[in-house]
Structures are given as structure tokens and as C-alpha cells.
């Protein structure tokens, strides 16, 4: 963890402690410190996706492609505002998988 922002380091540590090893990131100005920290953290692989509507489905595909009986969680990091709402269709789809 390399950020000088304490909350970013805490978030990265929490993700790691919950077994998150893959993160789909939609870089923006507001989440840049988080994206940078995740990208620099050993053991976490970032997958950049520019479209938030697709990012949730990409994360679901990565998780479902995991051959283990209990796939590891895949996180999605988007910027603030309506970007989060663009993940809603993928969240609904993942819930019913």
C-alpha cells in the first residue's frame, strides 16, 4: 500500500483481508488515489474498463470464470456520482446467478 491518504490504505487493506485479488477499475479524477494504490499493491490485479455499464459485467465474468468451487470476490471501483448507478444492472444479474 503506497498512498499517503490513510483511508485509501485502509480500504486496500480491507479488500485484501476479504480475499479480493482482482479489481475492475473505471479510472476517474475522484477515485484516482484508490486506483493508483490498488494498481501498486502486490497481489491485486487491476482490469481497467472505461465504461461503468460494462465494468460490472466484466467483474461478474471474471468471478464466474474462476474454476474453484467458491470463487474469490472481484471488486469494482468507479468514480463518484451516477457512475455507481451504472453498475446496478450487473449487480442485479450477479445476485440471481
What are the residue ranges of the model-derived segments?
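N-terminal alpha/beta PP-like core and its mobile active-site loop of ThDP/TPP-dependent enzymes
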Residues: 1-97
Amino acid at each position: 500500500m503506497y498512498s499517503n491518504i490513510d483511508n485509501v490504505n485502509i480500504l486496500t487493506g480491507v479488500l485484501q483481508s476479504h480475499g479480493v485479488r482482482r479489481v475492475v477499475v473505471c479510472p476517474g479524477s475522484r477515485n484516482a488515489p484508490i486506483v493508483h494504490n490498488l494498481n501498486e499493491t502486490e497481489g491485486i490485479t487491476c482490469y481497467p474498463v472505461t465504461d461503468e455499464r460494462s465494468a460490472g459485467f466484466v467483474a461478474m465474468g471474471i468471478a464466474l470464470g474462476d474454476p474453484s468451487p467458491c470463487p474469490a470476490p472481484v471488486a469494482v471501483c468507479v468514480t463518484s456520482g451516477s457512475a455507481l448507478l451504472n453498475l446496478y444492472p450487473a449487480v442485479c444479474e450477479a445476485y440471481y446467478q
